[in-house]
């Protein structure tokens, strides 16, 4: 693997590692109901997506995001001026990189977060640890958790969050835009046979995504069917097993498509990989890291992958 490729993939794996921590993540059942009763003249009670009752100061003026997808959502809702801090991995849009950094998503610096005096800290159940939430609450900081598992969940979550943050109109407009774009893609793919794909998280060891993950649902919306059938979120398996599955395409998430193609050229020279038809025929789809982030670029990720797997459906040459 090239050094640039390794660096890029390491960024994506940080999100996966939080899931692999198992019981360390938020483990409460998800709910979507928002309660509108006022807890005090200055606060309002909400039920977040893991069923916790959260009191949040109103109107919300200062927000800290502990997930790249949530940072992107805040920008999409026009709330970037209220974003006072985010993580080291919050790099989209470009302006997000200029925000005050509070460390990583898994182990943020609590002192840095507290110093920003946020009205609310936003987290994602599958990414941020329960210990982080508890530590913030002990500091008297409100924490609101999201918990999307599918494309539909992501859209509903963004709409719900817009209401919590006082940007319902912007949320409604964002949701309408995303649903229209997805509907256009679905219409073009109507009647098209799904491609058998393997989403590659890592090559050494070989790692993919399980059938219940958000990414697996993105694949379905893009006219793809994962050849990996696993209840685990991020299953690891042998190269021999991958060769046996013989996917039509290998799908990679990277901002450096040329780097991935060079890596595949190198893989083609290795024993085992050279037996995989997708490698021999260079059936490789490279999409942006938007596919890894359950946020406002989700429709973009679906369309980007769909165009590569089914160019004829979009009037393009294969």
Range-by-range predicted roles:
Residues 43, 61-116, 120-127, 132, ...:
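A short, structured surface patch at a secondary-structure boundary
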Residues 67, 125-126, 201, 231-234, ...:
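Short secondary-structure boundary segments
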Residues 12, 27-61:
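N-terminal hydrophobic or amphipathic helices and topogenic motifs
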Residues 87, 212-235, 254:
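His/Asp/Glu-enriched short active-site or ligand-binding loop at hydrolase and phosphoryl-transfer sites
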Residues 110-117, 139, 238-246:
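Short helices/loops that flank or line small-molecule/ion binding pockets
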Residues 3-16:
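Bacterial N-terminal signal peptides that target proteins for export
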Residues 14-27:
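Bacterial N-terminal signal peptides
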Residues 43-46, 52-53, 119-120, 130-207, ...:
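Extracytoplasmic substrate-binding proteins
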